[in-house]
C-alpha cells in the first residue's frame, strides 16, 4: 500500500503535520517494499485558498492508497474519498511510527472531515 503522510520536515522522524493542505511536505511510503520519497508542498503552504484540493490532487496523482494527517478539511476529504483514498488520523507521533501503526491496523480511519474549510 502507498501511504501519503503529512510532515513538517524531510525526515521520517518528523512529527505527522496536523495540517493537510498546508503541510510543509509529504512522505509517500510503500508499506510493502519499505521505500519512501519526500515531496515538498511549497506551492500550497501559503495558498490563499484551494490548498486542500490541490494537495489532495497531488496525492491522488502520486498513486497513494491512503493518507495520514492530523486533520482533513471537507473539500480535500470529498476528493480523496471519491478517488478511493482512505484517510487516517494520527496525532502526536512521528511519520515512521504512523507507518507502523497503519500497517498494524491501529490508526483510526476518518469517516468525515474533522475541520472546516480554510483551517490554518
Ranges and model annotations:
Residues 70:
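Conserved residues at the C-terminal ends of beta-strands
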Residues 57, 77-78:
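Alpha-helical segments flanking ligand/cofactor-binding loops in enzyme cores
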Residues 1-50, 54, 61-62, 81-83, ...:
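Non-catalytic interface/targeting segments
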Amino acid at each position: 500500500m502507498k501511504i501519503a503522510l503529512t510532515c513538517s520536515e524531510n525526515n521520517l522522524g518528523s512529527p505527522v503535520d496536523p495540517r493537510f493542505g498546508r503541510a510543509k511536505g509529504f512522505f509517500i511510503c510503500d508499506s510493502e517494499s519499505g521505500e519512501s520519497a519526500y515531496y515538498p508542498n511549497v506551492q500550497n503552504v501559503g495558498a490563499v485558498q484551494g490548498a486542500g484540493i490541490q494537495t489532495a490532487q497531488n496525492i491522488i496523482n502520486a498513486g497513494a492508497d491512503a493518507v495520514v494527517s492530523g486533520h482533513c478539511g471537507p473539500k480535500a476529504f470529498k476528493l480523496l474519498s471519491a478517488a478511493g483514498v482512505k484517510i487516517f488520523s494520527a496525532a502526536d507521533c512521528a511519520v515512521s511510527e504512523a507507518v507502523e501503526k497503519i500497517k498494524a491496523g491501529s490508526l483510526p480511519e476518518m469517516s468525515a472531515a474533522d475541520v472546516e474549510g480554510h483551517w490554518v
